[in-house]
Amino acid sequence: MKQKSIKNIRQEFKDKGIFYTPHTLAKKLSSYVDIEPQNVYDPTCGAGNLLSVFNKNLKKYGQELDADQLELIDLPNFVGYAGDTLSDDKFKGMQFDCIVANPPFSVKWNPDDLSGDVRFKDCPALPPPSKADWAFMLHILYHLSDEGVAVVLEFPGILYRGQREGIVRKWFVENNYIDRIVNIPGNTFEDTSISTCIIVLKKNRKTTDVIFEDGERTETVSQQTIAENDFNLSVSYYIQEEIEREEINQLELESDARWTFLERLRKELEFEKMVCEMEGISIQPFINAIRKILREYDNPKTTTNKNEKNQITLFDLEEC
């Protein structure tokens, strides 16, 4: 279906709580697919936006809870089914070279009915009923081929939330399934005002390190370091915000401070002179007191730095 037509129904989708994946974001996700897949699968395919950025000759598979959205998909080589991906998997037993997904964030699900399901049985814990995020990740992992790659857009909370989700996240890390975590700040793409993240999954990885990415900055982090951080996968844990620090010339800074003090003193003297004239008293005793203080520091043997803008002497103040 043409992008223009999708744009026209975006507001209707948003009113129903359906998240629309912009074309630019779909392209971003596909950029992390570093293999030549024979097929691509989206377990929550919506109107097919993520699948639409792949080669038209590639076999495409998708499942969507909303049958109305599924009917909008007009892609070549596409096979799709309507139904609940978690409770009614339409592609049981199938594996795919490439999986792209933007599952609904933190929706409810019923883990009690699926505890013995082949997709979830190997994990030591199931995600809580109130948050199905990691359930979708387990579903995706099950359907991923041994040499395949999965790229999933998720809510950042799954990177650090604890309890059951923390156990599942630890299992993913220890089994070396997580290849890369990418931070996507809010408003980076149209219709994505909240911050999100991209999680890249692979099986049979050659390294146990995880790559963290934030804009132009990347950091390769060992599994041991992640374990030391209680398996927290927040990008900000491993890539600190860079603050540009201006190089400071301490001598010049001190010189400027002395010159500023002199200018301030001159203005204070002007003010005191005006007050004394208004009150009909002499300012001379005040000037004499200042001279007395200056004589304590007016040592001819003392040299000033060559970088000084001007040498501050007793004469400067006497000119006031």
Predicted feature descriptions by range:
Residues P104-A135, G157:
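Mobile active-site "lid"/loop adjacent to the S-adenosyl-L-methionine
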Residues S234, Y238-L317:
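Basic, amphipathic N-terminal segments
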Residues I9-A101, S106, E147, F155-P156, ...:
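Conserved S-adenosyl-L-methionine
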Residues M1-R10:
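Long recognition/docking surfaces used for binding and targeting
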Residues E190-L253:
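Flexible, glycine-/basic-rich loop-and-beta segments that form/coincide
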